[in-house]
Amino acid sequence: MHGTPTEADLTRELSEDLKDAWERLRETATEFGPQRIYASHNSIMFSRKICYFFVRPKKKYLEVWFFLGRKIENSLIRQTMPASKRKIAHHVRIIHRDQVESPITDWLKEAYDVSESIRTPAKVKPRGRG
């Protein structure tokens, strides 16, 4: 893989189960509304104005990270960490397409819906006086 990877590059080596899970995850996300889906390094990003979730395809699972304005306590969440002052990153592991359902799909939809409101505002440079 030379240059910028594509979505196909990142998913080519997945097992059939993981490919099915990836396709279902992607289809589910596209139903949320307008967005940009693109490969970046070893991840596939899902973005409105900013990224609201991304997937890192691994050999045995899909590593999914999504961003919310609140922390979720659930056994499906493997890890959480602050992503900014207003955003908390949540990590789930997907190994089969049957996992791509509620509550994971609800959290992804929430991440899509709140991505604009939890965005860290751009810093405005103070105007010089005079």
Tell what function each PLM region has.
Residues 1-130:
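Charge-dense, helix-prone N-terminal extensions
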